[in-house]
Design a protein with these regions (language model features):
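Eukaryote-skewed repeat-based solenoidal scaffolds used as protein-protein interaction platforms
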Residues: 84-248
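Alpha/beta catalytic barrel-like cores
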Residues: 1-107, 193-194, 204-358
Length: 358
């Protein structure tokens, strides 16, 4: 896998996948998504086929993805074949450029399965290493070395993701300290095919925002990455930026009904507007008013910035419907991916991040 400027972590849900399809070709070339395949709610095989067909349609077969099957480990298709194996083999059969993702929690059978997929033609492998906010270099390196030994792969074959998960305000300093220390002493630092740093400060739920209310959340992961890229240790390799777009880390329960909300990414924060739905399925007036305030403010990127921004402007003008939470997830993700891609393009170190030293 070649270097990407940005690696968003996305769930394989309709809103996120449709947002990928709406990206312009220039933005697509700078992004390699890490897709977390969601667990099946019905027939496992049929579910996997739908997901792969959808992904092939919205992202294409020529664009790389990192395929994370962590939510599929206990599922099987007919005949007892693990769903994760079926997924990866199906992607290879469809000639999709999929990179299997391993993590330290995988048992030997899962690791061996991923090794076989790599041998069968997958474009290398990805290690996703979960780390606490106070992780020390030895903590990270032990997990990485153990996975190298278990998989039998060389660092040059591996995209390494250091995943700090959720990071909130009280953890800001500890997080910044940890990433500087871990990256300064990272094992095989110059050998990894790609080095990626991910985290998110987006909340797991929006329950603390009242209906017809609004709030903002700092993009701590972006602030920490950009600070490190500009002023980190000169000897440390600059990782590729990654985040969870406009979502929290955990997968919501299958029966969870998302609140009507607009999540809008700006330079250093997310704005969140939360509305209510009338009995006819349409958002209430207060939600439309908040959207109108955004589109007339200096913080609005403009209708040409992304599919999501065009939709938002059309909704305010009464040209677009706004009743589906899936549509608002697509709006938020579309805007976020395009916004971050532009933000990174304006960062002088972005072009060199994640890559091995010459």
């Amino acid at each position: 896998m070649g270097p990407a400027a940005y690696v968003p972590v996305l769930k394989s849900r309709a809103g996120e996948l449709r947002a990928l399809s709406a990206l312009d070709s220039t933005t697509k070339q700078t992004i390699t998504p890490l897709i977390e395949f969601t667990p099946p709610q019905d027939d496992v095989e049929a579910h996997q086929l739908r997901k792969i067909d959808s992904l092939a349609s919205v992202w294409g077969r020529d664009q790389r993805i990192l395929a994370d099957y962590r939510y599929l480990n206990d599922a099987q298709v007919d005949g007892g074949v693990p769903a994760a194996r079926y997924l990866l083999e199906l992607m290879l059969d469809r000639r999709m450029r999929a990179v299997p993702v391993m993590d330290p929690s995988n048992d030997r059978a899962v690791i061996e399965m991923a090794r076989r997929i790599v041998s069968a033609g997958a474009e290398g492998c990805c290690y996703r290493i979960p780390l606490p906010m106070d992780a020390r270099p030895d903590h990270a390196n032990e997990r990485i070395v153990d996975l190298l030994k278990a998989s039998g792969l060389d660092p040059e074959q591996v995209d390494l993701v250091l995943d700090y998960g959720s990071v909130f305000g009280t953890q800001r300093l500890g997080y910044a300290r940890s990433i500087r220390n871990v990256l300064a002493e990272l094992v095989h630092a110059d050998k990894w095919r790609n080095l990626i740093l991910t985290a998110t400060a987006f909340p797991e739920t929006l329950k603390d925002i009242p209906p017809d209310g609004k709030s903002s959340f700092e993009r701590i992961e972006w602030q920490s990455w950009s600070s490190f890229a500009e002023s980190g240790p000169k000897t440390a390799r600059i990782p590729t930026f990654s985040d969870y777009a406009t979502a929290g880390v955990t997968l919501p329960h299958a029966k969870y009904r998302a609140a009507l909300a607009l999540r809008y990414t700006q330079d250093h924060e997310w704005l969140v507007f939360k509305g209510r739905v009338h009995s006819n399925g349409e958002p209430n007036f207060a939600f439309r008013r908040m959207c109108d305030e955004l589109t007339t403010s200096q913080g609005f990127s403009g209708p040409q910035a992304s599919w999501g921004d065009r939709y938002l402007a059309g909704y305010v003008d009464g040209k677009m419907a706004g009743s589906s939470s899936t549509v608002w997830r697509q709006v938020a993700t579309s805007h976020h991916l395009s916004f971050v891609a532009r933000q990174l393009a304006g960062t002088r170190l972005a072009a060199a991040s994640g890559q091995r030293s010459a």
